[in-house]
Amino acid sequence: MGFTEETVRFKLDDSNKKEISETLTDVYASLNDKGYNPINQIVGYVLSGDPAYVPRYNNARNQIRKYERDEIVEELVRYYLKGQGVDL
């Protein structure tokens, strides 16, 4: 499959947005509880897809794996842009 010069639209199901946000908050807390740097661990997971970056503690690994990594990235970008005052 080759790349195209046409812009491709990507759409995340709106019902997942809140769930992803809550999951990231829970995973962050679990990583923090275990003494990890939560940001580094979440970034490692998102970039690599390796679930070993997230512990099984408090079911964090299973929680984050419920979502595709692109869905997580979309929610992170949306949250960041809203924080910067961008009207989405």
From Swiss-Prot:
Transmembrane portions of the chain: none
Pfam assignment, any one: IreB
InterPro entries xref list: IreB
Domain of life assignment: Bacteria
Entry's family note: Belongs to the UPF0297 family.
NCBIfam families in the cross-refs: PRK05473.1 (NF003997)
Protein name: UPF0297 protein SPD_0180
